[in-house]
Amino acid sequence: MKHLCSLLCFLLLALPALSKERTIKPGQIWPDAAGNHINAHGGGVLFHKGYYYWYGEHKAEKTSSALVGVTCYRSKDLVNWTYCGVALQVEDQVGSDIEKGCTLERPKVIYCPRTGKFVMWFHLELKGHGYAAARAAVAVADKPTGPFLYLRSGRVNPYCWPADWSEADRACADTLQTAHFGQWWTEPWRKAVAQGLFVKRDFNGGQMARDMTLYVDDDGRAYHIFSSEENLTLQVAELSDDFTYHTGRYWRIAPGGQNEAPAIFKHEGRYWLITSGCTGWDPNEARLFTSKSLLGPWEQLPSPCVGPNAKLTFGGQSTFILPVQGKPGAFIFMADIWRPKHPIDARYIWLPITFKDNVPVVEWRDEWVPEEVFE
């Protein structure tokens, strides 16, 4: 009887391990350890001391406004995730930048070894102002799970021209006025956008910052990459040594190209950037850019997506490229399938990135096992 009881106890203890999932199923419900669909949209992943931490927007049933904040999940294997709580809570205080009901999107977290702090940046729109604010916001924490302390928000790099502009470039942009263009999308208007029409317009107040990601380069320098200039141009802005301020140095990617949802990684000395076009919540074809320097110049290549519905990025939109720890050259493409009428039911697309002729390929798989793909 004693042996039988011991065996039963062993089996009960072993059940959680036996029930662990091994596969990622893109586009399907993804339960956490408690059986609840993971609620971390537009997010990114940080690896720290043996764990992956997944941060994302908490979505409600009927609104995309932030009613909770930024959630955090933790995993060792990229498949089984445990809910760690709300890492950054929106506030009840009326008039707060992050008042409940604001728009809080695409949170990303990086670790700053100089300060020992975890630093979160996100796109913020003030409650009741639609998408007019176009702010970048920052918060810090002592632990990866938070709580994160909100610091500030605002436009980016006021009174600063792009770092690679010549005096002639600055002089040209300084003559541009939005009032001179009564109609958008004309050839003269497009030329003016490329020359810095909106850079000049927002010179005093700072550059617009919407869809965004963060990237820490091999030398430890951190960068904030975001959609700016009325979502017409991406900007790459250098962060301070503590990762909580912009230094005033920034560069532009694909001026006038209408790119958002940036996701970046580096492989064998070359930077790769996946973006989307600007079609609201609706999916469109992914775009691929590459450069030997984070600061450019960037070259656009065909979409990296292959398989059913590849022309619409499998129904999703890029959010982050996840480097697999301990596996050089192994990356996961992360995207969201948005469902604006039922935001909480939005789904995730996670797919391994392969390389063909040294160019990234994101091929659809109904399901896949990370430990097999990245063995």
Give short role names for the model-derived ranges.
Residues 1-10:
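Sec-dependent signal peptide recognition
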Residues 18-375:
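Carbohydrate-active catalytic/glycan-binding domains of CAZyme proteins
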Residues 10-18:
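Hydrophobic h-region of N-terminal signal peptides that target proteins for export
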